[in-house]
Amino acid sequence: MKVVEVKHPLVRHKIGLMREGNISTKRFRELAAEVGSLLTYEATADFETEKVTIDGWNGPVEIEQIKGKKVTVVPILRAGLGMMDGVLEHVPSARISVVGIYRDEETLEPVPYFEKLASDMPSRIALVVDPMLATGGSMISTIDLLKERGCTAIKALVLVAAPEGVAALEKAHPDIELYTASIDDCLNEQGYILPGLGDAGDKIFGTK
């Protein structure tokens, strides 16, 4: 599995700001979208382009456009919605495919409860977004579902990842790509990433 920990200074700075314990909902939400945007820039760097001729202001002009598979953005509810606007800044015409999964706080196992995917998944590149890759369960379940629907080109974008989650994802889906702003130290006994960001969903939405 290709793992990219984005070390751009802007990413390091912004993810550092998100670690503040008493950060406001507004600020956390803004930063989640901003880092999501920067991760998307990195994740789309290998997209192929093709030359086309258009009518310019002074006659025909040759330009480059993205070619190949179209994109679907797949936010994992609910926290993944906090990154979606940042992703769409770069791929505004992408279809949105939504997957609802929550983590059982006792077993730490993923529990799916909703899905609404683009109808043409085999012809799309999926950018799966979720702020946290902790145990990896939610991400693995989402990618399982995408593959069942025929999607073969998948990139996962997360703000913060635990080594345990990275290892679990690589074991389950070695053929995907992972982009993250930080691979943190470890998980605690409750399955939270340390030092992490806390509960990203609560901080993005302002509700527990």
UniProtKB/Swiss-Prot annotation:
EC number: 2.4.2.9
Alphabetic keyword roster: Allosteric enzyme, Glycosyltransferase, GTP-binding, Magnesium, Nucleotide-binding, Transferase
Top class in the EC scheme: transferase
Superkingdom to which the source organism belongs: Bacteria
Pathway per the UniProt entry: Pyrimidine metabolism; UMP biosynthesis via salvage pathway; UMP from uracil: step 1/1
GO biological process: UMP salvage; uracil salvage
NCBIfam families, alphabetized: PRK00129.1, upp
Protein name, UniProt field: Uracil phosphoribosyltransferase
Provenance organism: Shewanella pealeana (strain ATCC 700345 / ANG-SQ1)
